[in-house]
Amino acid sequence: MTDLPDSTRWQLWIVAFGFFMQSLDTTIVNTALPSMAQSLGESPLHMHMVIVSYVLTVAVMLPASGWLADKVGVRNIFFTAIVLFTLGSLFCALSGTLNELLLARALQGVGGAMMVPVGRLTVMKIVPREQYMAAMTFVTLPGQVGPLLGPALGGLLVEYASWHWIFLINIPVGIIGAIATLMLMPNYTMQTRRFDLSGFLLLAVGMAVLTLALDGSKGTGLSPLTIDGLVAVGVVALVLYLLHARNNNRALFSLKLFRTRTFSLGLAGSFAGRIGSGMLPFMTPVFLQIGLGFSPFHAGLMMIPMVLGSMGMKRIVVQVVNRFGYRRVLVATTLGLSLVTLLFMTTALLGWYYVLPFVLFLQGMVNSTRFSSMNTLTLKDLPDNLASSGNSLLSMIMQLSMSIGVTIAGLLLGLFGSQHVSVDSGTTQTVFMYTWLSMAFIIALPAFIFARVPNDTHQNVAISRRKRSAQ
Protein backbone atom coordinates (compact mmCIF):
# COMPACT_ATOMS: atom_id res chain seq x y z
CA MET A 1 0.00 0.00 0.00
CA THR A 2 3.02 2.30 0.06
CA ASP A 3 2.47 3.26 -3.58
CA LEU A 4 -1.05 4.57 -2.91
CA PRO A 5 -1.57 8.36 -3.04
CA ASP A 6 -1.53 10.22 0.27
CA SER A 7 -5.20 11.14 -0.18
CA THR A 8 -6.18 7.47 -0.49
CA ARG A 9 -4.19 6.52 2.61
CA TRP A 10 -5.96 9.25 4.59
CA GLN A 11 -9.30 7.92 3.38
CA LEU A 12 -8.34 4.44 4.56
CA TRP A 13 -7.48 5.88 7.98
CA ILE A 14 -10.96 7.44 8.17
CA VAL A 15 -12.59 4.08 7.42
CA ALA A 16 -10.32 2.40 9.98
CA PHE A 17 -11.41 4.89 12.67
CA GLY A 18 -15.04 4.11 11.84
CA PHE A 19 -14.38 0.39 12.22
CA PHE A 20 -12.64 1.05 15.54
CA MET A 21 -15.53 3.13 16.94
CA GLN A 22 -18.09 0.51 15.98
CA SER A 23 -16.13 -2.48 17.29
CA LEU A 24 -15.14 -0.74 20.53
CA ASP A 25 -18.76 0.09 21.28
CA THR A 26 -19.87 -3.53 20.90
CA THR A 27 -17.70 -4.64 23.84
CA ILE A 28 -17.15 -1.59 26.04
CA VAL A 29 -20.77 -1.57 27.23
CA ASN A 30 -20.82 -5.13 28.60
CA THR A 31 -18.69 -4.50 31.68
CA ALA A 32 -20.68 -1.36 32.54
CA LEU A 33 -24.14 -2.98 32.69
CA PRO A 34 -24.27 -3.61 36.48
CA SER A 35 -23.17 -0.01 37.17
CA MET A 36 -25.75 1.29 34.70
CA ALA A 37 -28.44 -0.72 36.46
CA GLN A 38 -27.52 0.74 39.83
CA SER A 39 -27.37 4.29 38.48
CA LEU A 40 -30.70 4.05 36.65
CA GLY A 41 -32.46 2.22 39.48
CA GLU A 42 -33.09 -0.87 37.37
CA SER A 43 -32.63 -4.58 37.91
CA PRO A 44 -29.48 -5.98 36.27
CA LEU A 45 -31.79 -8.59 34.72
CA HIS A 46 -33.31 -5.89 32.49
CA MET A 47 -30.03 -4.43 31.26
CA HIS A 48 -29.60 -6.91 28.42
CA MET A 49 -31.93 -4.67 26.42
CA VAL A 50 -29.13 -2.07 26.29
CA ILE A 51 -27.25 -4.50 24.05
CA VAL A 52 -30.30 -5.84 22.23
CA SER A 53 -31.56 -2.38 21.21
CA TYR A 54 -28.23 -1.64 19.51
CA VAL A 55 -27.60 -5.00 17.83
CA LEU A 56 -31.20 -5.41 16.67
CA THR A 57 -31.19 -1.94 15.09
CA VAL A 58 -27.98 -2.82 13.26
CA ALA A 59 -29.60 -6.02 11.95
CA VAL A 60 -32.71 -4.15 10.77
CA MET A 61 -30.81 -1.34 9.04
CA LEU A 62 -28.02 -3.37 7.41
CA PRO A 63 -29.93 -4.28 4.22
CA ALA A 64 -30.50 -0.61 3.38
CA SER A 65 -26.95 0.63 3.99
CA GLY A 66 -25.35 -0.49 0.72
CA TRP A 67 -28.22 0.79 -1.41
CA LEU A 68 -28.14 4.17 0.36
CA ALA A 69 -24.39 4.47 -0.22
CA ASP A 70 -24.76 3.77 -3.93
CA LYS A 71 -27.71 6.15 -4.22
CA VAL A 72 -26.58 9.11 -2.09
CA GLY A 73 -22.81 8.59 -2.15
CA VAL A 74 -20.35 6.88 0.17
CA ARG A 75 -19.06 10.15 1.68
CA ASN A 76 -22.54 11.43 2.51
CA ILE A 77 -23.65 8.15 4.07
CA PHE A 78 -20.39 7.57 5.96
CA PHE A 79 -20.57 11.14 7.31
CA THR A 80 -24.21 10.59 8.32
CA ALA A 81 -23.29 7.30 9.99
CA ILE A 82 -20.57 8.95 12.11
CA VAL A 83 -22.85 11.86 13.06
CA LEU A 84 -25.70 9.54 14.09
CA PHE A 85 -23.34 7.30 16.04
CA THR A 86 -21.81 10.31 17.82
CA LEU A 87 -25.20 11.87 18.61
CA GLY A 88 -26.40 8.50 19.88
CA SER A 89 -23.35 8.33 22.16
CA LEU A 90 -24.11 11.81 23.54
CA PHE A 91 -27.75 10.92 24.19
CA CYS A 92 -26.67 7.67 25.88
CA ALA A 93 -24.47 9.62 28.28
CA LEU A 94 -27.32 12.06 29.02
CA SER A 95 -29.92 9.33 29.61
CA GLY A 96 -31.65 9.40 32.96
CA THR A 97 -33.90 6.36 32.50
CA LEU A 98 -33.56 2.95 30.89
CA ASN A 99 -36.07 3.82 28.15
CA GLU A 100 -34.09 6.94 27.21
CA LEU A 101 -30.92 4.85 27.07
CA LEU A 102 -32.58 2.24 24.84
CA LEU A 103 -33.73 4.90 22.36
CA ALA A 104 -30.25 6.45 22.29
CA ARG A 105 -28.69 3.03 21.71
CA ALA A 106 -31.07 2.46 18.80
CA LEU A 107 -29.87 5.75 17.27
CA GLN A 108 -26.31 4.54 17.73
CA GLY A 109 -27.31 1.32 15.98
CA VAL A 110 -28.54 3.20 12.90
CA GLY A 111 -25.11 4.80 12.58
CA GLY A 112 -23.29 1.55 13.31
CA ALA A 113 -25.30 -0.32 10.69
CA MET A 114 -24.12 2.05 7.97
CA MET A 115 -20.56 2.57 9.16
CA VAL A 116 -18.96 -0.85 8.54
CA PRO A 117 -20.59 -1.96 5.25
CA VAL A 118 -20.24 1.52 3.74
CA GLY A 119 -16.63 1.54 4.90
CA ARG A 120 -16.01 -1.73 3.03
CA LEU A 121 -17.71 -0.28 -0.04
CA THR A 122 -15.51 2.82 0.19
CA VAL A 123 -12.34 0.74 0.24
CA MET A 124 -13.58 -1.19 -2.79
CA LYS A 125 -14.05 2.06 -4.72
CA ILE A 126 -10.85 3.92 -3.80
CA VAL A 127 -8.29 1.09 -3.89
CA PRO A 128 -7.11 -0.83 -6.99
CA ARG A 129 -8.43 -4.39 -7.07
CA GLU A 130 -4.97 -5.96 -6.68
CA GLN A 131 -4.47 -4.06 -3.40
CA TYR A 132 -7.97 -4.58 -2.00
CA MET A 133 -7.03 -7.39 0.40
CA ALA A 134 -4.09 -5.44 1.84
CA ALA A 135 -6.28 -2.36 2.26
CA MET A 136 -9.06 -4.34 3.97
CA THR A 137 -6.52 -5.91 6.32
CA PHE A 138 -5.33 -2.41 7.23
CA VAL A 139 -8.78 -0.92 7.92
CA THR A 140 -10.09 -3.96 9.81
CA LEU A 141 -7.09 -4.18 12.16
CA PRO A 142 -8.47 -1.39 14.43
CA GLY A 143 -11.74 -3.34 14.41
CA GLN A 144 -9.85 -6.23 16.01
CA VAL A 145 -8.16 -3.94 18.55
CA GLY A 146 -11.54 -2.50 19.64
CA PRO A 147 -12.83 -5.73 21.25
CA LEU A 148 -9.43 -6.18 22.91
CA LEU A 149 -9.51 -2.73 24.56
CA GLY A 150 -13.27 -2.43 25.06
CA PRO A 151 -13.93 -4.58 28.16
CA ALA A 152 -10.92 -3.35 30.14
CA LEU A 153 -11.42 0.28 29.10
CA GLY A 154 -15.11 0.07 29.97
CA GLY A 155 -14.31 -1.40 33.37
CA LEU A 156 -11.63 1.23 34.00
CA LEU A 157 -13.95 4.12 33.13
CA VAL A 158 -16.79 2.72 35.24
CA GLU A 159 -14.57 2.08 38.25
CA TYR A 160 -12.67 5.37 38.28
CA ALA A 161 -15.16 7.74 36.60
CA SER A 162 -18.72 6.69 35.71
CA TRP A 163 -20.51 4.62 33.07
CA HIS A 164 -21.37 7.80 31.15
CA TRP A 165 -17.76 8.05 29.97
CA ILE A 166 -17.95 4.86 27.92
CA PHE A 167 -20.17 6.89 25.58
CA LEU A 168 -18.57 10.32 26.01
CA ILE A 169 -15.21 9.09 24.68
CA ASN A 170 -16.88 8.54 21.30
CA ILE A 171 -17.71 12.22 20.89
CA PRO A 172 -14.26 13.76 20.15
CA VAL A 173 -13.36 10.81 17.92
CA GLY A 174 -16.68 11.16 16.10
CA ILE A 175 -16.27 14.91 15.55
CA ILE A 176 -12.77 14.45 14.12
CA GLY A 177 -13.97 11.58 11.93
CA ALA A 178 -16.96 13.54 10.60
CA ILE A 179 -14.83 16.58 9.69
CA ALA A 180 -12.17 14.40 8.06
CA THR A 181 -14.84 12.56 6.06
CA LEU A 182 -16.23 15.79 4.63
CA MET A 183 -12.78 17.13 3.78
CA LEU A 184 -10.99 14.06 2.47
CA MET A 185 -13.41 11.38 1.28
CA PRO A 186 -14.76 11.42 -2.31
CA ASN A 187 -18.50 10.99 -2.78
CA TYR A 188 -18.69 8.00 -5.11
CA THR A 189 -22.15 7.05 -6.35
CA MET A 190 -23.42 4.21 -8.52
CA GLN A 191 -26.50 3.52 -10.57
CA THR A 192 -28.93 1.67 -8.34
CA ARG A 193 -31.90 -0.53 -8.93
CA ARG A 194 -35.18 0.22 -7.20
CA PHE A 195 -34.98 -0.50 -3.48
CA ASP A 196 -37.29 -3.25 -2.22
CA LEU A 197 -38.99 -1.07 0.39
CA SER A 198 -41.89 -3.48 0.91
CA GLY A 199 -39.55 -6.39 1.60
CA PHE A 200 -37.37 -4.25 3.87
CA LEU A 201 -40.35 -3.13 5.98
CA LEU A 202 -41.75 -6.67 6.26
CA LEU A 203 -38.40 -8.05 7.43
CA ALA A 204 -37.82 -5.14 9.81
CA VAL A 205 -41.23 -5.54 11.44
CA GLY A 206 -40.87 -9.32 11.67
CA MET A 207 -37.42 -9.21 13.28
CA ALA A 208 -38.20 -6.38 15.68
CA VAL A 209 -41.53 -7.56 17.07
CA LEU A 210 -40.49 -11.21 17.42
CA THR A 211 -37.33 -10.25 19.32
CA LEU A 212 -39.38 -7.94 21.54
CA ALA A 213 -41.96 -10.67 22.15
CA LEU A 214 -39.20 -13.13 23.05
CA ASP A 215 -38.28 -10.95 26.02
CA GLY A 216 -41.64 -11.86 27.56
CA SER A 217 -44.06 -9.95 29.72
CA LYS A 218 -41.62 -9.67 32.65
CA GLY A 219 -38.88 -8.15 30.53
CA THR A 220 -41.05 -5.78 28.52
CA GLY A 221 -43.83 -5.05 30.99
CA LEU A 222 -46.40 -5.91 28.33
CA SER A 223 -49.44 -8.07 28.98
CA PRO A 224 -49.46 -11.71 27.79
CA LEU A 225 -52.19 -10.82 25.29
CA THR A 226 -50.01 -8.08 23.81
CA ILE A 227 -47.07 -10.49 23.60
CA ASP A 228 -49.28 -12.97 21.71
CA GLY A 229 -50.29 -10.18 19.36
CA LEU A 230 -46.64 -9.29 18.70
CA VAL A 231 -45.83 -12.91 17.89
CA ALA A 232 -48.75 -13.06 15.45
CA VAL A 233 -47.68 -9.81 13.76
CA GLY A 234 -44.08 -10.99 13.47
CA VAL A 235 -44.99 -14.37 11.98
CA VAL A 236 -47.42 -12.80 9.51
CA ALA A 237 -44.78 -10.25 8.44
CA LEU A 238 -42.20 -12.96 7.74
CA VAL A 239 -44.71 -15.13 5.85
CA LEU A 240 -45.71 -12.12 3.76
CA TYR A 241 -42.05 -11.51 2.95
CA LEU A 242 -41.66 -15.09 1.71
CA LEU A 243 -44.70 -14.63 -0.52
CA HIS A 244 -43.35 -11.25 -1.65
CA ALA A 245 -39.88 -12.64 -2.48
CA ARG A 246 -41.12 -15.69 -4.36
CA ASN A 247 -40.45 -15.25 -8.09
CA ASN A 248 -39.49 -11.60 -7.42
CA ASN A 249 -36.18 -10.66 -9.05
CA ARG A 250 -36.10 -7.35 -7.14
CA ALA A 251 -36.61 -8.87 -3.71
CA LEU A 252 -34.32 -7.69 -0.93
CA PHE A 253 -33.00 -11.25 -0.56
CA SER A 254 -33.69 -13.73 -3.33
CA LEU A 255 -35.09 -17.10 -2.31
CA LYS A 256 -32.80 -18.61 -4.97
CA LEU A 257 -30.06 -18.38 -2.35
CA PHE A 258 -31.52 -21.39 -0.57
CA ARG A 259 -31.11 -23.64 -3.59
CA THR A 260 -27.45 -23.89 -2.58
CA ARG A 261 -27.34 -26.55 0.12
CA THR A 262 -24.22 -25.32 1.89
CA PHE A 263 -25.69 -21.82 2.08
CA SER A 264 -28.91 -23.11 3.65
CA LEU A 265 -27.07 -25.28 6.17
CA GLY A 266 -24.48 -22.60 6.90
CA LEU A 267 -27.10 -19.89 7.39
CA ALA A 268 -29.22 -22.09 9.66
CA GLY A 269 -26.14 -23.12 11.62
CA SER A 270 -24.91 -19.53 11.85
CA PHE A 271 -28.28 -18.37 13.14
CA ALA A 272 -28.54 -21.11 15.77
CA GLY A 273 -24.83 -20.99 16.61
CA ARG A 274 -24.67 -17.27 17.20
CA ILE A 275 -27.72 -17.36 19.44
CA GLY A 276 -25.68 -19.46 21.85
CA SER A 277 -22.33 -17.75 21.47
CA GLY A 278 -23.99 -14.33 21.50
CA MET A 279 -24.90 -14.90 25.15
CA LEU A 280 -21.27 -15.21 26.26
CA PRO A 281 -19.99 -11.60 25.89
CA PHE A 282 -23.06 -10.40 27.81
CA MET A 283 -23.19 -13.08 30.51
CA THR A 284 -19.48 -13.35 31.32
CA PRO A 285 -18.82 -9.83 32.70
CA VAL A 286 -22.25 -9.74 34.38
CA PHE A 287 -21.56 -13.08 36.08
CA LEU A 288 -18.07 -12.03 37.15
CA GLN A 289 -19.38 -8.83 38.78
CA ILE A 290 -22.76 -9.84 40.19
CA GLY A 291 -22.12 -13.54 40.78
CA LEU A 292 -18.50 -13.47 41.91
CA GLY A 293 -18.04 -9.89 43.14
CA PHE A 294 -15.32 -8.82 40.69
CA SER A 295 -14.76 -5.10 40.19
CA PRO A 296 -15.72 -3.69 36.75
CA PHE A 297 -12.05 -3.23 35.81
CA HIS A 298 -11.10 -6.75 36.94
CA ALA A 299 -14.05 -8.19 35.02
CA GLY A 300 -12.98 -6.26 31.93
CA LEU A 301 -9.41 -7.55 32.18
CA MET A 302 -10.73 -11.11 32.36
CA MET A 303 -12.28 -10.69 28.91
CA ILE A 304 -8.94 -9.93 27.23
CA PRO A 305 -7.74 -13.58 27.07
CA MET A 306 -10.90 -14.51 25.17
CA VAL A 307 -10.19 -11.85 22.53
CA LEU A 308 -6.52 -12.87 22.30
CA GLY A 309 -7.51 -16.50 21.77
CA SER A 310 -9.91 -15.45 19.04
CA MET A 311 -7.32 -13.30 17.25
CA GLY A 312 -4.61 -15.94 17.49
CA MET A 313 -6.74 -18.72 16.06
CA LYS A 314 -7.69 -16.78 12.92
CA ARG A 315 -4.24 -17.41 11.46
CA ILE A 316 -4.64 -21.20 11.30
CA VAL A 317 -8.37 -21.70 10.74
CA VAL A 318 -7.92 -22.30 7.01
CA GLN A 319 -5.35 -25.05 7.60
CA VAL A 320 -7.58 -26.71 10.21
CA VAL A 321 -10.62 -26.74 7.90
CA ASN A 322 -8.57 -27.99 4.95
CA ARG A 323 -7.20 -30.80 7.11
CA PHE A 324 -10.41 -32.01 8.76
CA GLY A 325 -13.26 -30.66 6.62
CA TYR A 326 -16.15 -28.36 7.51
CA ARG A 327 -18.40 -30.95 9.11
CA ARG A 328 -15.87 -32.28 11.60
CA VAL A 329 -14.57 -28.83 12.50
CA LEU A 330 -18.03 -27.32 13.01
CA VAL A 331 -19.42 -30.25 15.02
CA ALA A 332 -16.27 -30.44 17.16
CA THR A 333 -16.08 -26.70 17.85
CA THR A 334 -19.80 -26.48 18.62
CA LEU A 335 -19.66 -29.28 21.17
CA GLY A 336 -16.29 -28.00 22.37
CA LEU A 337 -17.67 -24.53 23.03
CA SER A 338 -20.48 -26.07 25.07
CA LEU A 339 -17.96 -28.01 27.16
CA VAL A 340 -15.73 -24.95 27.63
CA THR A 341 -18.80 -23.01 28.81
CA LEU A 342 -19.42 -25.69 31.46
CA LEU A 343 -15.73 -25.63 32.38
CA PHE A 344 -15.85 -21.85 32.88
CA MET A 345 -18.90 -22.12 35.13
CA THR A 346 -17.34 -24.95 37.17
CA THR A 347 -13.96 -23.30 37.73
CA ALA A 348 -15.62 -19.98 38.59
CA LEU A 349 -18.02 -21.46 41.15
CA LEU A 350 -15.21 -23.53 42.70
CA GLY A 351 -13.21 -20.34 43.18
CA TRP A 352 -10.33 -21.36 40.90
CA TYR A 353 -9.99 -17.84 39.58
CA TYR A 354 -6.39 -18.31 38.42
CA VAL A 355 -7.67 -20.88 35.88
CA LEU A 356 -10.30 -18.56 34.36
CA PRO A 357 -7.96 -16.67 31.97
CA PHE A 358 -6.85 -19.97 30.42
CA VAL A 359 -10.44 -21.16 30.07
CA LEU A 360 -11.48 -17.88 28.46
CA PHE A 361 -8.48 -18.04 26.10
CA LEU A 362 -9.58 -21.53 25.06
CA GLN A 363 -13.14 -20.29 24.64
CA GLY A 364 -11.93 -17.55 22.30
CA MET A 365 -9.96 -20.05 20.20
CA VAL A 366 -12.89 -22.44 19.81
CA ASN A 367 -15.39 -19.67 19.13
CA SER A 368 -13.17 -18.02 16.51
CA THR A 369 -12.65 -21.31 14.67
CA ARG A 370 -16.38 -21.91 14.57
CA PHE A 371 -17.22 -18.36 13.43
CA SER A 372 -14.73 -18.40 10.56
CA SER A 373 -15.83 -21.87 9.45
CA MET A 374 -19.51 -20.94 9.54
CA ASN A 375 -18.94 -17.80 7.47
CA THR A 376 -16.93 -19.48 4.74
CA LEU A 377 -19.21 -22.53 4.57
CA THR A 378 -22.24 -20.29 4.09
CA LEU A 379 -20.81 -18.26 1.21
CA LYS A 380 -18.30 -20.49 -0.54
CA ASP A 381 -20.64 -22.23 -3.03
CA LEU A 382 -22.87 -19.31 -4.00
CA PRO A 383 -22.85 -18.34 -7.70
CA ASP A 384 -21.33 -14.94 -8.42
CA ASN A 385 -24.67 -13.27 -9.18
CA LEU A 386 -25.97 -14.17 -5.69
CA ALA A 387 -22.77 -13.69 -3.66
CA SER A 388 -23.47 -10.06 -2.67
CA SER A 389 -27.06 -10.79 -1.64
CA GLY A 390 -25.97 -13.86 0.32
CA ASN A 391 -23.29 -11.90 2.15
CA SER A 392 -25.80 -9.19 3.11
CA LEU A 393 -28.28 -11.77 4.39
CA LEU A 394 -25.56 -13.49 6.41
CA SER A 395 -24.51 -10.16 7.96
CA MET A 396 -28.11 -9.44 8.94
CA ILE A 397 -28.61 -12.92 10.39
CA MET A 398 -25.40 -12.60 12.41
CA GLN A 399 -26.63 -9.43 14.12
CA LEU A 400 -30.18 -10.72 14.57
CA SER A 401 -29.08 -13.99 16.15
CA MET A 402 -26.76 -12.20 18.57
CA SER A 403 -29.60 -9.93 19.69
CA ILE A 404 -31.82 -12.99 20.19
CA GLY A 405 -29.04 -14.68 22.15
CA VAL A 406 -28.68 -11.76 24.56
CA THR A 407 -32.48 -11.62 24.89
CA ILE A 408 -32.64 -15.33 25.77
CA ALA A 409 -29.81 -14.92 28.29
CA GLY A 410 -31.75 -12.14 30.00
CA LEU A 411 -34.89 -14.26 29.87
CA LEU A 412 -33.09 -17.20 31.52
CA LEU A 413 -31.79 -14.98 34.30
CA GLY A 414 -35.32 -13.73 34.84
CA LEU A 415 -36.72 -17.25 34.96
CA PHE A 416 -34.15 -18.56 37.43
CA GLY A 417 -33.67 -15.44 39.53
CA SER A 418 -35.64 -12.97 41.56
CA GLN A 419 -36.51 -9.51 40.25
CA HIS A 420 -33.43 -7.96 41.86
CA VAL A 421 -30.14 -9.80 42.09
CA SER A 422 -27.33 -8.60 44.34
CA VAL A 423 -23.92 -9.94 45.29
CA ASP A 424 -25.14 -10.56 48.84
CA SER A 425 -28.00 -12.78 47.73
CA GLY A 426 -27.51 -16.41 48.73
CA THR A 427 -29.28 -17.59 45.60
CA THR A 428 -27.26 -15.53 43.12
CA GLN A 429 -24.69 -18.18 42.23
CA THR A 430 -27.40 -20.83 41.95
CA VAL A 431 -29.29 -18.60 39.53
CA PHE A 432 -26.19 -18.15 37.39
CA MET A 433 -25.37 -21.87 37.56
CA TYR A 434 -28.76 -22.82 36.11
CA THR A 435 -28.39 -20.10 33.48
CA TRP A 436 -24.94 -21.34 32.40
CA LEU A 437 -26.20 -24.94 32.23
CA SER A 438 -29.04 -23.82 29.97
CA MET A 439 -26.62 -21.82 27.82
CA ALA A 440 -24.32 -24.83 27.40
CA PHE A 441 -27.29 -26.88 26.18
CA ILE A 442 -28.35 -24.17 23.70
CA ILE A 443 -24.78 -23.78 22.43
CA ALA A 444 -24.56 -27.53 21.68
CA LEU A 445 -27.79 -27.73 19.64
CA PRO A 446 -26.41 -26.47 16.28
CA ALA A 447 -24.21 -29.58 16.14
CA PHE A 448 -27.26 -31.40 14.74
CA ILE A 449 -27.36 -28.92 11.84
CA PHE A 450 -23.63 -29.08 11.14
CA ALA A 451 -23.72 -32.89 11.17
CA ARG A 452 -25.62 -32.65 7.86
CA VAL A 453 -22.83 -30.76 6.11
CA PRO A 454 -21.08 -32.89 3.42
CA ASN A 455 -17.99 -34.35 5.02
CA ASP A 456 -15.39 -34.19 2.26
CA THR A 457 -14.02 -30.69 1.67
CA HIS A 458 -12.61 -31.45 -1.78
CA GLN A 459 -15.90 -33.00 -2.86
CA ASN A 460 -17.70 -29.82 -1.79
CA VAL A 461 -15.41 -27.73 -3.97
CA ALA A 462 -16.00 -29.98 -6.98
CA ILE A 463 -19.77 -29.83 -6.52
CA SER A 464 -19.71 -26.04 -6.21
CA ARG A 465 -17.77 -25.71 -9.46
CA ARG A 466 -20.31 -27.80 -11.34
CA LYS A 467 -23.12 -25.71 -9.92
CA ARG A 468 -21.44 -22.49 -10.97
CA SER A 469 -20.77 -23.71 -14.48
CA ALA A 470 -24.35 -24.94 -14.84
CA GLN A 471 -25.89 -21.56 -14.04
Swiss-Prot record:
Keywords: Cell inner membrane, Cell membrane, Membrane, Transmembrane, Transmembrane helix, Transport
Pfam families linked to this entry: MFS_1
MF terms in GO: transmembrane transporter activity
GO cellular component, as recorded: plasma membrane
InterPro entries the UniProt entry points to: EmrB-like (IPR004638), MFS (IPR011701), MFS_dom (IPR020846), MFS_trans_sf (IPR036259), Multi-R_MdtD (IPR023721)
Residue stretches spanning the membrane: 12-32, 49-69, 77-97, 102-124, 138-158, 165-185, 197-217, 225-245, 263-283, 286-306, 342-362, 396-416, 431-451
Entry's localization field: Cell inner membrane
Keyword rRNA processing tagged: no
Domain of life: Bacteria
Keyword Cell inner membrane: yes
Main location: membrane
Membrane topology (UniProt): Multi-pass membrane protein
Residue numbers on the Cytoplasmic membrane side: 33-48, 98-101, 159-164, 218-224, 284-285, 363-395, 452-471
Periplasmic side: 1-11, 70-76, 125-137, 186-196, 246-262, 307-341, 417-430
Family matches, as SUPFAM superfamilies: MFS general substrate transporter
HAMAP family xrefs: MFS_MdtD
UniProt record similarity statement: Belongs to the major facilitator superfamily. TCR/Tet family.
Xref: NCBIfam families: efflux_EmrB (TIGR00711), PRK10504.1 (NF007799)
PANTHER family: BLR6921 PROTEIN, MAJOR FACILITATOR SUPERFAMILY MULTIDRUG TRANSPORTER MFSC
Protein name: Putative multidrug resistance protein MdtD
Annotated source species: Escherichia coli O8 (strain IAI1)
